[in-house]
Amino acid sequence: MSSFLDQYKRQPKLFIDLPSKGASYDESVIQDQQYTQLPVFGMNTMDEIMIKTPDALFSGEATAEIIKSCVPMVKDPWKIMGFDLDYILLAIRMATYGDKMPVSSNCPMCDTQNDNEVMLTKMLEKIDSAQLETSVKIKELTFKLQPLTYKRTTDISQKHFTLQKQLATIEVADDKETDKQPHREKLLRAMGD
């Protein structure tokens, strides 16, 4: 029996096929391991509020929750690979606001503001046509490659941000240059880890 409210339920706006075709994903990432025809819903009010919360954005939690809300077939957004993530986020943007995204820029020479529109379907096509390379051979060495997950990318970004803030603190300190150098070297080594 259907309710008269069924017509007001949130409906998928588009369906997407992941560019990776599910390569490197286990059953915990996408429901039923369905990598094609994933329904994409537009953001709701709660999603809009979450995307404007700085702490949730910095931690990556806002993006993960919005993906779960708008692409419910994704069970664990933290395990999504980078180019699939870009594809999903573009699809959510399209489902919410439409195919055109306004972009503004100022000319560095004359300071004139230029307003344009980006067609998001073109961007999706570009991502979709990319080939996923899983190995690279250089002379006699073969390197096995795996794209970064959203979790790994977020962790790296947070670590890098923290180290940059610490480095900036060292630079503005009134200490002598010779006192700053060991602290700088320690932080730069930490950045490389």
Regions found by a protein language model. Name each.
Residues M1-D193:
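Long C-terminal interaction/binding lobes of large macromolecular proteins
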